[in-house]
Amino acid sequence: MEEQGRCACRLEDRPHYEEMVLETMLYSARLKERVARENSAVIVAMSRLMAETFEGGGRVLFCGNGGSAADAQHLATELTIRYRSSVQRPALAAIALSSDSMALTAGANDLGYDAVFARLVEAYGREGDLLVGISTSGNSQSVANAFMAAQERGLKCIALLGGDGGAMKGKADLEIVVPHTGSADRVQECHIAIGHVIIDLVERMLGYCTSSR
Protein backbone atom coordinates (compact mmCIF):
# COMPACT_ATOMS: atom_id res chain seq x y z
CA MET A 1 0.00 0.00 0.00
CA GLU A 2 1.37 3.37 -1.02
CA GLU A 3 1.86 6.08 1.57
CA GLN A 4 -0.53 8.97 1.13
CA GLY A 5 0.89 11.55 -1.28
CA ARG A 6 3.85 9.37 -2.26
CA CYS A 7 4.59 8.65 -5.92
CA ALA A 8 4.27 4.99 -6.92
CA CYS A 9 7.53 5.22 -8.89
CA ARG A 10 10.71 3.81 -7.42
CA LEU A 11 14.35 4.60 -8.08
CA GLU A 12 14.79 1.68 -10.43
CA ASP A 13 11.69 2.73 -12.42
CA ARG A 14 13.01 6.18 -13.26
CA PRO A 15 16.04 6.05 -15.60
CA HIS A 16 15.80 9.70 -16.61
CA TYR A 17 16.83 11.53 -13.45
CA GLU A 18 19.92 12.95 -15.13
CA GLU A 19 17.75 14.52 -17.84
CA MET A 20 15.54 15.97 -15.10
CA VAL A 21 18.60 17.53 -13.45
CA LEU A 22 19.69 19.07 -16.75
CA GLU A 23 16.20 20.30 -17.60
CA THR A 24 15.70 21.87 -14.17
CA MET A 25 19.03 23.65 -14.05
CA LEU A 26 18.84 24.88 -17.64
CA TYR A 27 15.34 26.24 -17.02
CA SER A 28 16.64 28.03 -13.93
CA ALA A 29 19.50 29.50 -15.97
CA ARG A 30 17.15 30.64 -18.75
CA LEU A 31 14.83 32.25 -16.23
CA LYS A 32 17.71 34.16 -14.64
CA GLU A 33 18.85 35.29 -18.09
CA ARG A 34 15.36 36.56 -18.89
CA VAL A 35 15.12 38.41 -15.58
CA ALA A 36 18.56 39.95 -16.14
CA ARG A 37 17.78 41.09 -19.68
CA GLU A 38 14.40 42.56 -18.74
CA ASN A 39 15.47 44.15 -15.45
CA SER A 40 19.13 45.14 -15.67
CA ALA A 41 18.31 48.85 -15.43
CA VAL A 42 16.05 48.23 -12.44
CA ILE A 43 18.75 46.21 -10.67
CA VAL A 44 21.18 49.09 -11.17
CA ALA A 45 18.57 51.53 -9.83
CA MET A 46 17.97 49.31 -6.79
CA SER A 47 21.70 49.13 -6.17
CA ARG A 48 22.07 52.90 -6.45
CA LEU A 49 19.18 53.46 -4.03
CA MET A 50 20.74 51.07 -1.53
CA ALA A 51 24.20 52.63 -1.90
CA GLU A 52 22.73 56.10 -1.40
CA THR A 53 20.93 54.84 1.70
CA PHE A 54 24.18 53.63 3.24
CA GLU A 55 26.08 56.71 2.12
CA GLY A 56 23.49 58.90 3.82
CA GLY A 57 23.78 57.03 7.11
CA GLY A 58 20.59 55.03 6.64
CA ARG A 59 19.89 51.37 7.22
CA VAL A 60 18.43 48.67 5.01
CA LEU A 61 15.67 46.54 6.50
CA PHE A 62 14.70 43.20 4.93
CA CYS A 63 11.56 41.12 5.41
CA GLY A 64 10.01 37.97 3.96
CA ASN A 65 8.38 34.70 4.99
CA GLY A 66 9.66 31.13 4.82
CA GLY A 67 12.31 30.80 2.14
CA SER A 68 12.08 34.55 1.57
CA ALA A 69 12.87 35.08 5.25
CA ALA A 70 15.98 32.97 4.72
CA ASP A 71 16.90 35.13 1.71
CA ALA A 72 16.32 38.27 3.79
CA GLN A 73 18.64 37.03 6.53
CA HIS A 74 21.20 35.81 3.99
CA LEU A 75 21.44 39.18 2.24
CA ALA A 76 21.37 41.25 5.42
CA THR A 77 24.22 39.18 6.84
CA GLU A 78 26.35 39.60 3.72
CA LEU A 79 25.90 43.36 3.95
CA THR A 80 26.63 43.51 7.66
CA ILE A 81 29.48 40.97 7.85
CA ARG A 82 30.96 40.30 4.42
CA TYR A 83 29.97 39.38 0.88
CA ARG A 84 33.36 38.44 -0.61
CA SER A 85 36.60 37.93 1.26
CA SER A 86 38.48 39.86 -1.43
CA VAL A 87 36.65 43.08 -0.55
CA GLN A 88 37.70 44.88 2.61
CA ARG A 89 35.08 47.37 3.77
CA PRO A 90 33.28 48.60 6.88
CA ALA A 91 30.09 46.89 8.01
CA LEU A 92 26.95 48.10 6.25
CA ALA A 93 23.88 48.53 8.47
CA ALA A 94 21.33 45.92 7.42
CA ILE A 95 18.65 44.25 9.55
CA ALA A 96 16.55 41.17 8.72
CA LEU A 97 13.23 41.66 10.51
CA SER A 98 12.61 37.90 10.45
CA SER A 99 15.66 37.07 12.56
CA ASP A 100 14.21 37.89 16.01
CA SER A 101 12.08 34.87 16.96
CA MET A 102 10.88 36.47 20.21
CA ALA A 103 9.60 39.58 18.43
CA LEU A 104 7.98 37.47 15.69
CA THR A 105 6.15 35.16 18.08
CA ALA A 106 5.10 37.96 20.43
CA GLY A 107 3.84 40.02 17.51
CA ALA A 108 2.00 37.09 15.96
CA ASN A 109 0.39 36.25 19.29
CA ASP A 110 -0.50 39.78 20.39
CA LEU A 111 -1.12 41.63 17.12
CA GLY A 112 -1.62 38.94 14.48
CA TYR A 113 1.06 37.71 12.12
CA ASP A 114 0.15 40.11 9.32
CA ALA A 115 1.15 43.02 11.59
CA VAL A 116 4.52 41.66 12.69
CA PHE A 117 6.84 43.26 10.13
CA ALA A 118 4.91 46.54 10.14
CA ARG A 119 5.40 46.73 13.90
CA LEU A 120 9.13 46.15 13.55
CA VAL A 121 9.32 48.82 10.84
CA GLU A 122 7.66 51.19 13.31
CA ALA A 123 10.34 50.29 15.85
CA TYR A 124 13.42 50.42 13.64
CA GLY A 125 12.56 52.35 10.48
CA ARG A 126 13.51 55.99 10.08
CA GLU A 127 13.24 58.44 7.21
CA GLY A 128 16.24 57.82 4.98
CA ASP A 129 16.17 54.06 5.56
CA LEU A 130 15.24 51.48 2.91
CA LEU A 131 12.93 48.45 3.19
CA VAL A 132 13.44 45.41 0.94
CA GLY A 133 10.39 43.12 0.90
CA ILE A 134 10.63 39.66 -0.62
CA SER A 135 7.59 37.57 -1.63
CA THR A 136 7.57 34.77 -4.20
CA SER A 137 3.82 35.21 -4.78
CA GLY A 138 3.52 38.95 -4.24
CA ASN A 139 0.64 38.24 -1.86
CA SER A 140 2.37 38.18 1.53
CA GLN A 141 0.15 40.43 3.62
CA SER A 142 2.76 40.80 6.35
CA VAL A 143 5.23 42.19 3.80
CA ALA A 144 2.60 44.40 2.15
CA ASN A 145 1.72 45.86 5.56
CA ALA A 146 5.41 46.50 6.22
CA PHE A 147 5.55 48.52 2.98
CA MET A 148 2.63 50.66 4.13
CA ALA A 149 4.25 51.27 7.52
CA ALA A 150 7.56 52.09 5.84
CA GLN A 151 6.06 54.58 3.42
CA GLU A 152 4.19 56.30 6.25
CA ARG A 153 7.54 56.81 7.98
CA GLY A 154 9.36 58.10 4.90
CA LEU A 155 11.27 54.94 3.94
CA LYS A 156 11.84 53.94 0.32
CA CYS A 157 10.79 50.40 -0.64
CA ILE A 158 12.16 47.72 -2.95
CA ALA A 159 10.07 44.64 -3.83
CA LEU A 160 11.35 41.30 -5.10
CA LEU A 161 8.26 39.42 -6.26
CA GLY A 162 7.23 36.42 -8.33
CA GLY A 163 4.43 35.14 -10.53
CA ASP A 164 2.38 38.10 -11.78
CA GLY A 165 3.45 40.28 -8.85
CA GLY A 166 0.27 39.63 -6.88
CA ALA A 167 -1.33 42.26 -4.67
CA MET A 168 2.05 43.87 -3.98
CA LYS A 169 2.74 44.77 -7.60
CA GLY A 170 3.12 48.53 -7.95
CA LYS A 171 3.35 49.12 -4.19
CA ALA A 172 7.11 49.75 -3.97
CA ASP A 173 9.39 52.45 -5.35
CA LEU A 174 11.27 49.81 -7.35
CA GLU A 175 10.25 46.23 -8.07
CA ILE A 176 11.23 43.11 -9.96
CA VAL A 177 8.71 40.38 -10.72
CA VAL A 178 10.20 36.98 -11.57
CA PRO A 179 7.81 35.52 -14.21
CA HIS A 180 7.47 32.00 -12.86
CA THR A 181 4.33 30.42 -11.40
CA GLY A 182 3.45 27.10 -9.82
CA SER A 183 6.34 26.86 -7.36
CA ALA A 184 8.46 29.16 -5.24
CA ASP A 185 11.84 27.49 -5.80
CA ARG A 186 12.78 28.98 -9.17
CA VAL A 187 11.63 32.42 -8.00
CA GLN A 188 13.77 32.13 -4.87
CA GLU A 189 16.80 31.22 -6.98
CA CYS A 190 16.34 34.41 -8.98
CA HIS A 191 15.76 36.53 -5.88
CA ILE A 192 19.01 35.46 -4.22
CA ALA A 193 20.91 35.98 -7.50
CA ILE A 194 19.44 39.48 -7.80
CA GLY A 195 20.38 40.16 -4.18
CA HIS A 196 23.96 39.08 -4.77
CA VAL A 197 24.30 41.29 -7.85
CA ILE A 198 22.88 44.23 -5.88
CA ILE A 199 25.41 43.75 -3.07
CA ASP A 200 28.24 43.53 -5.60
CA LEU A 201 27.11 46.76 -7.26
CA VAL A 202 26.59 48.51 -3.92
CA GLU A 203 30.18 47.73 -2.93
CA ARG A 204 31.42 49.06 -6.26
CA MET A 205 29.29 52.21 -6.01
CA LEU A 206 30.64 52.88 -2.53
CA GLY A 207 34.19 52.45 -3.84
CA TYR A 208 35.01 49.21 -2.02
CA CYS A 209 35.21 46.76 -4.94
CA THR A 210 37.75 46.89 -7.75
CA SER A 211 37.76 43.28 -9.02
CA SER A 212 36.24 42.49 -12.41
CA ARG A 213 33.77 39.88 -11.16
From Swiss-Prot:
<feature type="binding site">
    <location>
        <position position="188"/>
    </location>
    <ligand>
        <name>substrate</name>
    </ligand>
</feature>
<feature type="binding site">
    <location>
        <begin position="65"/>
        <end position="67"/>
    </location>
    <ligand>
        <name>substrate</name>
    </ligand>
</feature>
<keyword id="KW-0479">Metal-binding</keyword>
<dbReference type="GO" id="GO:0008968">
    <property type="term" value="F:D-sedoheptulose 7-phosphate isomerase activity"/>
</dbReference>
<dbReference type="InterPro" id="IPR004515">
    <property type="entry name" value="Phosphoheptose_Isoase"/>
</dbReference>
<comment type="function">
    <text>Catalyzes the isomerization of sedoheptulose 7-phosphate in D-glycero-D-manno-heptose 7-phosphate.</text>
</comment>
<feature type="binding site">
    <location>
        <position position="196"/>
    </location>
    <ligand>
        <name>Zn(2+)</name>
    </ligand>
</feature>
<feature type="binding site">
    <location>
        <begin position="109"/>
        <end position="110"/>
    </location>
    <ligand>
        <name>substrate</name>
    </ligand>
</feature>
<comment type="pathway">
    <text>Carbohydrate biosynthesis; D-glycero-D-manno-heptose 7-phosphate biosynthesis; D-glycero-alpha-D-manno-heptose 7-phosphate and D-glycero-beta-D-manno-heptose 7-phosphate from sedoheptulose 7-phosphate: step 1/1.</text>
</comment>
<keyword id="KW-0963">Cytoplasm</keyword>
<dbReference type="InterPro" id="IPR001347">
    <property type="entry name" value="SIS_dom"/>
</dbReference>
<dbReference type="GO" id="GO:0097367">
    <property type="term" value="F:carbohydrate derivative binding"/>
</dbReference>
<dbReference type="GO" id="GO:0005975">
    <property type="term" value="P:carbohydrate metabolic process"/>
</dbReference>
<feature type="binding site">
    <location>
        <position position="78"/>
    </location>
    <ligand>
        <name>Zn(2+)</name>
    </ligand>
</feature>
<feature type="binding site">
    <location>
        <position position="140"/>
    </location>
    <ligand>
        <name>substrate</name>
    </ligand>
</feature>
<comment type="similarity">
    <text>Belongs to the SIS family. GmhA subfamily.</text>
</comment>
<feature type="binding site">
    <location>
        <position position="188"/>
    </location>
    <ligand>
        <name>Zn(2+)</name>
    </ligand>
</feature>
<dbReference type="InterPro" id="IPR046348">
    <property type="entry name" value="SIS_dom_sf"/>
</dbReference>
<feature type="binding site">
    <location>
        <position position="74"/>
    </location>
    <ligand>
        <name>Zn(2+)</name>
    </ligand>
</feature>
<protein>
    <recommendedName>
        <fullName>Phosphoheptose isomerase</fullName>
        <ecNumber>5.3.1.28</ecNumber>
    </recommendedName>
</protein>
<dbReference type="GO" id="GO:0005737">
    <property type="term" value="C:cytoplasm"/>
</dbReference>
<dbReference type="GO" id="GO:0008270">
    <property type="term" value="F:zinc ion binding"/>
</dbReference>
<feature type="domain" description="SIS">
    <location>
        <begin position="50"/>
        <end position="208"/>
    </location>
</feature>
<feature type="binding site">
    <location>
        <position position="78"/>
    </location>
    <ligand>
        <name>substrate</name>
    </ligand>
</feature>
<dbReference type="GO" id="GO:2001061">
    <property type="term" value="P:D-glycero-D-manno-heptose 7-phosphate biosynthetic process"/>
</dbReference>
<dbReference type="Pfam" id="PF13580">
    <property type="entry name" value="SIS_2"/>
</dbReference>
<keyword id="KW-0119">Carbohydrate metabolism</keyword>
<feature type="binding site">
    <location>
        <begin position="135"/>
        <end position="137"/>
    </location>
    <ligand>
        <name>substrate</name>
    </ligand>
</feature>
<dbReference type="InterPro" id="IPR035461">
    <property type="entry name" value="GmhA/DiaA"/>
</dbReference>
<dbReference type="InterPro" id="IPR050099">
    <property type="entry name" value="SIS_GmhA/DiaA_subfam"/>
</dbReference>
<keyword id="KW-0862">Zinc</keyword>
<keyword id="KW-0413">Isomerase</keyword>
